[in-house]
Amino acid sequence: MKQISNSLRNSNKIPIWFMRQAGRYLPEYKKVRETTKNFLDFCFDVNKATEVTLQPIRRYGLDAAIIFSDILVLPSALGWEVDFKENIGPVLKQFKSQKDFQYLQRDSNNKLENVFKIIKKVKEKLPSNTSLIGFAGSPWTVMSYMLEGKGKRDFITSKKFVYENKILAKDLLNFITEKTADYLINQAKSGADILKIFDSWSGVLAEDDFTEFVIEPTKKIILKVKEVFINIPIITFPKGAGLLYEKFIKEVPIDILAVDQMVPLEKMKEWSNKVIVQGNLDPVVLLTNKEIIEEKTYKILQGMKGKNFIFNLGHGILPETPPENVEFLTKYIRLYEKKNSNSTF
């Protein structure tokens, strides 16, 4: 994992990267983004996606780049109708019955080929000491978007569907699970050093459903990927899992666990004895001022001192975040490292 793995072996070095580190808060991103109207077209544009992936690395000198893409690239590549509408977000054809399987293609690699080209091109341009992260949405989260037709907070339609259509729901889940594993394997073949599975909506499920729709498919994906790339680190992020994080840790063969900002620091410390923990500064903190950023960051750094830890946010950088605050945060962590290594902090 290059820089990240080297950092973890050196207890004084804290690996840093941010979810949505390439995005709407950066003026250089906006300049490139405005050249393409359709968001999915932008994600599949090799030159433009490569450029915006590299922008935060140039600006902040982070330890990892994450490919600029979207979790809904996969269902789109599988033939599912996906659109991104301004001020609304993703809008999808709703999956309602068995007949909707006819719209899903078994082979997505042709359309995803540009994603793999982006990974290869970024890898060529990335500093040699910087890790490259590829990613996909979790089967449950991708499936939820397909069942809802758009992003929601409660996912009532999705949960009602799986309760009433258990066999069909499981068929859809298994299909997405298989395709997600293949997608991640091909990202690794293209040069990704680390892989991440984003489960944005795992927190809406009760325990039994969490086991069936989050834990089991995640295990299948990891095991399938590891059959081909046994040593590739995989980051899992069951956002909002709450008390079920512990069940997830116990039952999923985790390398790195990303946690949201609701997870107590004491739990992060405890879990870091079993897995590498990534997190978990509240993204809203970056909307404030340097004093608050320093205060909140120091608490996390002190709490995770000497632990298996990667610094990140509890979710993605918000669009209204001042870039200078991200720069301050990054420099503050580097200063903490330096002072800590000299035992004067």
UniProtKB/Swiss-Prot annotation:
Subunit structure: Homodimer.
SUPFAM superfamilies: UROD/MetE-like
GO process annotations (BP): protoporphyrinogen IX biosynthetic process
EC assignment: 4.1.1.37
Record flagged with keyword Cytoplasm: yes
Gene from which this protein is expressed: hemE
Pfam families for this protein: URO-D (PF01208)
Described function: Catalyzes the decarboxylation of four acetate groups of uroporphyrinogen-III to yield coproporphyrinogen-III.
Similarity comment: family membership: Belongs to the uroporphyrinogen decarboxylase family.
Protein name: Uroporphyrinogen decarboxylase
UniProt-annotated location(s): Cytoplasm
Lineage: superkingdom: Bacteria
Keyword annotations from UniProtKB, A to Z: Cytoplasm, Decarboxylase, Lyase, Porphyrin biosynthesis
Site (Transition state stabilizer) residue list: 70
GO cellular component: cytosol
Pathway recorded for this protein: Porphyrin-containing compound metabolism; protoporphyrin-IX biosynthesis; coproporphyrinogen-III from 5-aminolevulinate: step 4/4
Annotated positions binding substrate: 20-24, 39, 70, 145, 200, 315
Example GO molecular function: uroporphyrinogen decarboxylase activity
Catalytic activity: uroporphyrinogen III + 4 H(+) = coproporphyrinogen III + 4 CO2
